[in-house]
Amino acid sequence: MKKFLVSLAALALFLGLAACSSNDESKTEEKDTKKTEEAAAPKNDVKKDLVKFYNGLAEKINAKDGDLNAYEAKAAKKDPKPEDLPTAEDRAKASESAAAVAAELNSTQIPVELKDHQADLEAAVKEYAAAYQAKADELKKDAPNFEAAEATYTKAEEALGKVYEAEKMFPPSLGNQVN
């Protein structure tokens, strides 16, 4: 009888240990899954922060560039009547508007959440600011030529696009947001 009880106790102990060890494995898997999810979460946050930053840039520009957009719309008309052409006053307002956008962009701070891309984003914002400043300077002339400003703007778009591509996102076009 003693052998039977010892065998039964050994079997119970074996089953107990087997059950506990499978529990530990599932806990380990849960911990690994949580660690993986936590590691993946910051990437998603960077993407969200990047989109928030981009939208913030667009809002800042749109808040200041109304007169510039009005001037560009008038200047872009095909076969306009003389009264529809932009006036010197329109040009002066557009110049002030472009300078205000440049000043606003120059004061833009890169969020801490985007510190991994800070240098690239700062370079892109500086290019955008330089493009608007070039427009402001050209608008002070009687016959403004925006080719240099457009080239600088294109460089800024490419710089911002590279940051987006580094995060495996489609590059945006700020020009579509602000015009």
Task: Give the residues covered by each predicted segment.
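Bacterial lipoprotein signal-peptidase II cleavage site
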Residues: 4-7, 16-40
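C-terminal amphipathic alpha-helix
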Residues: 42-84, 88, 130-179
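Amphipathic, well-ordered alpha-helical segments in soluble domains
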Residues: 64-67, 94-104, 127, 131
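Polyanion-binding interface signature
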Residues: 91
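Short amphipathic alpha-helical coiled-coil/interface segments
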Residues: 98, 121, 125, 153-160
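Short, solvent-exposed, charged loop/turn and helix-capping segments
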Residues: 98-122, 174-178
